[in-house]
Amino acid sequence: MLLKNASFYDDEVLKRADIRLKDSLITEIEENLSPINNEEVIECEKLFVLPSFIDLSVTCLEGYENLKQKAFKGGVGLLNVFNGDQSDIKNIMAIKNNQLADIATLKHKGGEILIAPSDAFLELISHYAKSYNLPLLISLENSFEALNSGALAYELGQNFVDNAFENTRLVRFMEVSRALQIPMLLDKVSSATTLKLIKAFNDLGAKLQAQTPLSHLVLDESVYEDYEPRFKIAPPLRDKEGQNALKEALKNNEIAMLTSLHAFKNSNAQLFEESAFGCESIEDAFSVAYTFLVQKKVISFQQLIKVMATNQARFLKLNAGEVKENQLANLMIVDLNAQTRVSNQNSPFYGLELYGEVQRMILKGQTTFIKENACKKS
């Protein structure tokens, strides 16, 4: 496959060239490449090529193939799915049914990432991660309270997460990272206090990174005043001050990765109190991130690529996440000028007008998604 006249970033440098894909890899990046042996040619003039996103915090409740198609539409090529047998990234859930999993056997069967859902068996899990050099994702089970503690929770009479206790378990992991020099990714970080603790422990020698839900950078808890079930997300959204603190942390590279936190809302309940938690957002991931983070100048386009593709690939030790020769050809082609509106009524972003739209998804050199009438063959 040959991508003609592609605009892309090589590190921080904006370039325009032709990109050849062959045998799952990006094999050539040069100007004026010619097709070889009936090679498929995709005209990318006025379009942008970037690495496909990697989402490390996805819950599948709607069927894996349906989830994958939604992900492709949102520019997400690889998924780490928590609760199913199918996942692009082979994960090892360290604890199942309150018992320690057979981590050694699962590693030998191809496990690529170790997930700790609680701080039980912390010592054993940490030593397995260190011994097998496994990326360790700390994704603690949610308390499933509707709001964070504060004036709005009291005003609305909703159950809330007590902020005084939200970091007590995480601190144990932070200290283990420092003491044993184990790299850890802390999932669903939505508190400025958590980010300050991460920085403090890293200053002491820990190897911690933070991953934050995209929704928490776009929305704040004021949406709860409408009592709409689509906003019932775990962990809960923050107040405006907390949201602004997250944006500032992202701008200052204190947040390493973003996640759609996608979870199908497996409920038709009309009342906020009775509805299921969830965040149906992955199908609009690129457009939401581009509109609210890049267009609104929270971060640069280059930084968006890093926090949604490059840093994830490095954490997983994958040969992907950048547009470079000899990297895996996991790419998306986008139209940055296209305008769309979120149509999924269960999405927290429903009704929002967005900029940027995925035209084509390519995984290992093969097209997996194409928007109708997009990316014409030349």
Question: Where are these predicted regions, by residue range?
Answer:
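Metal-cofactor-binding active-site regions of metalloenzymes
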Residues: D55-L61, G74-A104
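C-terminal cap of metal-dependent C-N hydrolases
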Residues: E274, L328-C375
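Histidine/acidic residue-rich metal-binding segments in metalloenzymes
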Residues: T105-L258
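Short, surface-exposed connector motifs at secondary-structure boundaries
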Residues: G75-L79, K90-N91, K109-G110, V176-M184, ...
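His/Asp/Glu-enriched, well-ordered alpha-helical/loop segment
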Residues: Q158, A164-V171, V176-Q181, N253, ...
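Divalent metal-coordination and catalytic microenvironments
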Residues: A6, S24, K46, S57, ...
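N-terminal metal-binding scaffold of metallo-dependent hydrolase/deaminase domains
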Residues: M1-I36
